[in-house]
Amino acid sequence: MRQVLAAADKEGVRVSIIPFYNDYIPTHPTIDVVGRTKLIDMRATPLDNIGCAMFKRAADIACSLALLLLTSPLMLAAAVGVRLSSPGPVLFRQKRVGKNKKPFYMYKFRSMRVTGTEDTGWSTKEDARKTRFGSFIRKYSIDELPQFFNVLKGDMSLVGPRPEIPFHVNHFKEEIPLYLVRQQVRPGITGWAQVNGLRGDTSIEKRVQYDIWYIENWSIALDIKILLRTVFGGWVNGEKL
């Protein structure tokens, strides 16, 4: 190989090679150098760039602060409605799995009656645990507003794969080979899968495909597109996690 490269350089000819592991190399590989050894990052993403990651985090903080101020009257009304609808706390805290598989507590306005089964699975439209007011705030995703506090804390991002409970993560990682790739970024309040109709009791395999596509193709423009689709119809109706 050295002789071939030397001969090509002598003649001013560019050389391209097909490595024996060609099938595994990503479309846009990132090369790291450790000592004299070159390493190919097999799953590099745009958010690996510290500048991109810092910009996204700064945007999350600024936008979540602004949205908390804008929605504070609505959140106050929701809190009163939850309190009057059924006995129990206003906020529902549920353990979810975040970036790098780190667990955190995600906040929601409580939409169900207090039982011992709220941590076990997804809700459906016919779920008897939901209160009438709870169904209303779920329909318009008002129950998700407290997650702006999760964004401020750094547990979540405005946009990213939706976080799931540890039980589901432990199950799906055995069934879906690329499932844990989702955990390489902060989970989001909304995501590419969700605005494409994959929410609640829908195909997990398709959801993972959309989540990984988002991670590999992240851009500021894509986040803005997802947020706009969320506001103008992508986040209304249907059942959520």
Show where each model-derived region lies.
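Short glycine-/acidic-enriched loop or helix-start segments at secondary-structure transitions
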Residues: 1-3, 26-27, 80, 93, ...
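N-terminal hydrophobic signal-anchor/signal peptide
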Residues: 1-72
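Short, glycine-rich, amphipathic interfacial segments at transmembrane boundaries or analogous
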Residues: 19-23, 28-35, 92-132, 190-207
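Thr-Gly-centered strand-to-loop micro-motif
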Residues: 42, 92, 159-160
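A hydrophobic, helix-centered structural microdomain
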Residues: 51-116, 150, 220, 225-241
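A short, structured surface patch at a secondary-structure boundary
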Residues: 123-186, 226-230, 234
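Short, conserved catalytic or interaction motifs in soluble domains
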Residues: 161, 197, 217
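Short beta-strand/loop motif that positions the catalytic acidic residue
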Residues: 212
